Amino acid sequence: MSISQPERVLIIKLRHHGDVLLSTPVVDALKHKFPDCEVDMLVYAATTDVILDNRQISNIFTIDREWKKQGVRVQLAHEKALFKSLKARNYDWAFNISDQWRAAFLAKLCAHYSAGIACCKRDNFLWRHCHDFLNEELDTSHHMVESNLNVLQPLVLPEEYPAKVRMEISPANRESVLEKLSAQGWNGEPYVLAHPGARWFFKCWEDGKNAALLQLLLLNGKNVVLTASPDAAEQEMVQSILGRLKIPDGVHVWVLSGCLNLRELAAAIDGA
């Protein structure tokens, strides 16, 4: 074990899909400076899709939010199994880029050295005790990627690595999207992809405005692929938008609603 030449590192990011994706430059920065280092990640189970094909990551460990609904005994069994798996990896470093106590405790207990962010809301003895190194919490004038990379300062200075968000897409997921499009009559035509839904509906544009934009694209000869998650509200949104469209001759609208995982959605976006 070496503090300056790590062989095994754990990155903890317990947040949403986008937050996990924006943590991938941390993995890249470590692999850039320490190519032989094994980098693992601990994330919520629901967010694994965005990093599942990332070849820079050796192992992905997960916490399922459903554990707490299964009763205290079952939850404790899951937590114990997770702790045992993490401890067995014998990490040189754990980098906590979350603000949860669970992440702080695991970082402290599962690695020789732990680093985190000096969060304002965690300005207390216990948070400091859980981390051997605490880096400054950057203000909102900095991008989240910069804030994430800032946690690496004991090993990697931010200026040493050009930040790059990475979401790899496997050939199998690319092929799956092509098959699903082909099943709807797509024959390789270029398309514009629209994904009007979101986890939080306050972020969504109005159905009428989405439809007006897509109608304009169709009138200008652009084919459209319309995607949505399996969520019932998003399905309803797609139907509402489709019901407002008048599709001219010679152009197409293909709907991939509720049938794509996140990696397939990324492949569809990449093909647009």
Which stretches of residues belong to each language-model region?
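Catalytic machinery of carbohydrate-active enzymes
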Residues: M1-A272
